[in-house]
Amino acid sequence: MKILVVSDSHGESADIIKLKEKYANETVAMIHCGDSELDNGDPALESYIYVRGNCDYDARFPNEVVTNIAGYRFFITHGHLYNVRMTLQSLSYKAEEEGAQIILFGHTHHVGSELGDDGVLYVNPGSILLPRGRKDRTYAILEIEDHTIHVQIHDHAGNLMKNLSASYQMR
């Protein structure tokens, strides 16, 4: 099973529409981790699970979402309310509180993934519009196979970035 994860599109709806069309038949879920800068109900966000980022001014967006997908409990947030620029510790506490096994977040515009000592998988898909730390605009595909999660990072054109992708054995 595959899950599309995108973040920080900052008003650029064409990219998230293109990704939605590309992956609609391949994924069980599509997630936007905030800072879409679109209105709640915008057609570009249709089919996405989405949260509010620090640049989203529509108060109807949820700050966070907890949901079960493909047998895993996900906690989805933008990250600005959890100080993710400095540490993942607050997210770790929230994961424990929510019983989450996978945390998806954005905000930093830095792409990355890691399996914490707490057994929680942390994934930041980077920014589809304004990357930091590298020039590549990115998004993630999570491919779930039993107890293995493959975090596949793709550039804006859809090319797999093997050096940023990783597989994690979940407990």
Cite the ranges covered by each PLM segment.
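Active-site-proximal beta-strand elements of phosphoester/diester hydrolases
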Residues: 2-8, 73-80, 121-126
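Helix-adjacent hinge/juxtasegments
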Residues: 51-54, 60-103
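Charged phosphate-binding loop/patch that engages nucleotide di/tri-phosphates or the phosphate backbone
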Residues: 145-171
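Residue-level detector of beta-strand face positions
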Residues: 66-68, 113, 141, 152
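A short, polar/proline- and glycine-enriched secondary-structure boundary/capping micro-motif
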Residues: 15-16, 85-89, 134, 159-168
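Active-site metal-binding loops of divalent metal-dependent hydrolases
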Residues: 7-10, 34-36, 54-56, 79-81, ...
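Core catalytic region of metal-dependent phosphoesterases/phosphodiesterases
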Residues: 2-70
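Conserved beta-sheet core of the metallophosphoesterase superfamily
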Residues: 49, 84-147
